[in-house]
Design a protein with these regions (language model features):
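Extreme N-terminal basic, low-complexity initiation segments
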Residues: 2-6
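Bacterial N-terminal signal peptides
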Residues: 24-34
Length: 330
């Protein structure tokens, strides 16, 4: 524990010259008292609100059973710097004294909480996750689909949800600008909306990193020859806003005409169906040069690709046979 002297009165002029031993006695006594003053008896987390005074911070510490309000005030009065204390959530470690805590509050080294947005999460679920985080405050609308970069984001207790969303969207803007500048002539997309839309489809179609450019190549080829994309996730999006459907897709949903269903329309949907990650965006801006037009699941999370409809139909039958073995089909 660091020793600090708390002296609340000043000597009269000449007093130190006349009574040097009195001052020595006072100094020694102050050192002893400071040494005996206990630090925080436990680890704890405290929140210092915006605009809190030294006195209020001391009260918060005392209420938490960490250090007395008076010792904290005295530390700030006699030995603290002029730096203001900063709001936020702080980790107080066992043994920290008033001076340690004051320095921590002035440093602004708050606890950094994390909110994780996985690749392919739709905006409605991003909104739900942020609204469920009770350490954040404020209302927000559902962010525009495709505007959020999936990643882990740090925040502090009491921060606004709007501020967190703003960082997420700024991250997407930055990453997209970097990738767009490196796009290859082969890409099928002409602008940001098209790029994020196709990237969101790639994101939802495969979770295998090595397949992203291959899947992007398939869709690039289909767009080039005027074939419908026929991507199952585009059927689901109008039904659930991107949430898992939890059942088999209905025939009526496959045939539904809307702005997203790529079984019933040519070209790209009107906008993204999820928030794509950096790798999927990069894949559609630099798709694999291949001549595949079809792909179907293999049953292990990956896909098998085909150049012709005959090859594809054979692969589909293998997939159906596997599903029957698993009891997923009759």
């Amino acid at each position: 524990m660091r020793i600090r002297i708390f002296v609340s009165w000043k000597p009269r002029i000449g007093e130190f010259r006349v009574h040097p031993f009195r001052w020595l006695t006072i100094t020694i006594l102050a050192l002893v008292l400071a040494a005996c003053s206990p630090g925080a008896p436990k680890d704890a987390e405290v929140v210092i609100p915006q605009g809190a005074s030294i006195a209020r911070a001391g009260e918060i510490l005392e209420e938490a059973g960490l250090v007395s309000a008076s010792s904290f005030r005295n530390q700030a009065r006699f030995f603290g710097s002029y730096d203001p204390i900063k709001p936020g959530e702080y980790k107080i470690e066992k043994g920290m004294d008033a001076g340690d805590i004051l320095a921590l509050f002035q440093s602004g080294k708050t606890i950094q909480r994390l909110v994780m947005i996985p690749e392919g999460m739709p905006s409605i679920m991003v909104w739900e996750r942020l609204m469920a985080e009770k350490r954040l405050k404020g209302e927000i609308p559902v962010p525009a689909e495709g505007s959020i970069l999936p990643d882990s984001y740090a925040f502090t207790t009491g921060e606004t949800r709007a501020a967190v969303v703003k960082r997420m969207q700024a991250a997407m803007d930055k990453v997209f600008a970097e990738l767009w500048a490196k796009r290859k002539p082969r890409t099928a997309v002409k602008n940001r909306n098209e790029a994020l839309t196709l990237a969101s489809i790639v994101e939802k179609e495969t979770a295998v990193p090595a397949e992203r450019r291959t899947v992007a190549g398939v869709y690039t080829n289909r767009l080039a020859v005027g074939m419908r994309l026929q991507a199952d996730p585009t059927i689901i999006y109008p039904v659930t806003k991107g949430k898992p459907i939890g059942r088999r897709i209905l025939r009526s949903e496959i045939q539904a005409v809307n702005d997203y269903n790529t079984y019933a329309m040519a070209g790209l949907p009107k906008g993204p169906i999820a928030n794509p990650g950096k790798a999927s965006i990069a894949a559609v801006l630099d798709p694999e040069p291949n001549d595949y037009l079809f792909f179907v699941a293999k049953g292990d999370g990956s896909h098998i690709f085909a150049r012709t409809l005959a090859e594809h139909n054979a692969n589909v039958q293998k997939w159906y046979a596997l599903r029957r073995e698993r009891g997923e089909m009759e």
